[in-house]
């Protein structure tokens, strides 16, 4: 079987990028795939916003569980199972083909103050586990609650109005956690206990997505929720943020998620 280098979720199924180029994986057909995650040779996906599907090492996709109550948003494979973030800002854990609520997350301090700018319910947009084992759940809009004990207890971190859109854990620095928010790039060097905001070098502060590639942090920024003058930034050798320009347009119209 050709080695898969990248899986791409779309509104009409999953595409694989291999050494031979992209091709659609026929196993999921035209099902909408809104989230992907991988660990230990297994890929996970959210299909049709309600189903969890798993891709084994042989490339076969299998439906594992379905949520009848909430739309599913994001995935985090864990050593002891799979965590799933949902609309209405809940966490679910996959246990023997059943999705059950992580009840302590529903009781985290400050939950009553979570909101969205348009008045709808908040959502868990992304989840990350750092190399120290701490779990960080990005709520939009509700900060980044974290757990030090695998999800048994949760505590709030970062100001809610930082309006965080994504949280990621650094793949090689145990205590470094990064977040993209409406205030810029949020950086924690102590596993989420405290945060600082980096804005220097950015043309605007509204950050939508963050990723780490080797020693480089990548950040997308725009004028606001509706996009406009969106651009990609990267950190330099001295950790300053600079705009990426080679082979890219000066600005993107929409937000880069």
Could you say what each language-model-derived stretch is?
Residues 1-257:
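Extracellular glycan-interacting surfaces
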